[in-house]
Amino acid sequence: MSSVSPALQPRRIKARFIGPLALTLAFIMCVFAVAIYSIETRIRDRDLAERSAAVAKLFAQKLDKDTHKMMATLRAMMINQAMVNAFRQGDRTALAQQGGELFRSLNAEHKITHLYFIRPDLVSLYRFHSPAVFGDDIQRVTLQQARESQKPAHGLELGPMGTLTLRLVTPWRQDGELLGYLEIGEEIEHLLDEIRHSLAIDLLVLVDKRYLTPAQWQRGLDLLRGKIAGEEGQHPGDA
């Protein structure tokens, strides 16, 4: 009849507990890891939601501020009698003389990239940012809204190269006569840069290709290639 040495009995007792204890510890570690991951996920989601809300709020504030600035600019132009006469007569040369320097100043100091004089029939009379292009029908939403309501209308719209532009359109009436419409706009890239610096975050604007015409897509690609080529050719000391 065999007998177990007293020295081996504690080892057998320990062996019986090691397996269950190891499983218990492994289970506890798994639960702990899941809990930590869940907490980190909630913190990350909350941080993302707070950042998104901050971006949306700041973006709306900047759009509102710039819209008021553009409206003030248009009102100043509408009390310029020389511009009134030039617009009423459809005199492109006079418009260029009266507003050319103003547009250059607005572009350099306030990032204004678009300025239009548009006839009552929504045909472009003069583009300060592109004088050679005129006589085309303009069918943008903001212009249609301004015509239907006969009140200022503004909003973000895609430009001809797929760039987002804040546009403001207002009817121009003089002594009850509708002379046409004034449209002013700014591409919003500088607003995004300001938000990046203010909130220390990266922003990326994506445009669904389905909403672009082939011509817009190609012009956008050409513009992007030009920017990349310019940055690659820039000397580090010139940055």
Across the structure, where does each feature detected by a protein language model lie?
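Extreme N-terminal signal-anchor transmembrane helix of membrane signaling/transducer proteins, especially
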Residues: 3, 11-42, 46
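Extracytoplasmic/periplasmic sensory segments of membrane signal-transduction proteins
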Residues: 50-59, 66-153, 196, 207-215, ...
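Intrinsic low-complexity, intrinsically disordered coil/linker regions enriched in small/polar
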Residues: 190-239
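Residue-level signal for short hydrophobic patches within transmembrane helices
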Residues: 19-23, 56-59, 63
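Mobile, glycine-rich extracellular loop/lid and propeptide segments
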Residues: 65, 143-144, 158, 168
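Conserved beta-strands of PAS-like sensory domains
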Residues: 163-197
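Generic short beta-strand
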Residues: 115, 169-170, 203
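Short clusters of small/polar residues that mark proteolytic maturation junctions
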Residues: 129-130, 157, 183
